[in-house]
């Protein structure tokens, strides 16, 4: 699971760099937002799979909700 999260972070960084090269500053800024709910990240040393499943089931992407509220005010 952590591997997938790391891959996702790399994809956002690469997409942000590409947006910068294409002079798409707004998109680069959106992709560079580092807004996540720290309390929802389980400890890495011995995470309980059931707890992770519950966190993922109830998780709302904060980046998406922030962008939605910004553009749909």
Swiss-Prot record:
It holds the Pfam family ASFV_360. GO terms for biological process: taxis. Belongs to the asfivirus DP63R family. This is Uncharacterized protein DP63R. It comes from African swine fever virus (isolate Pig/Kenya/KEN-50/1950) (ASFV).
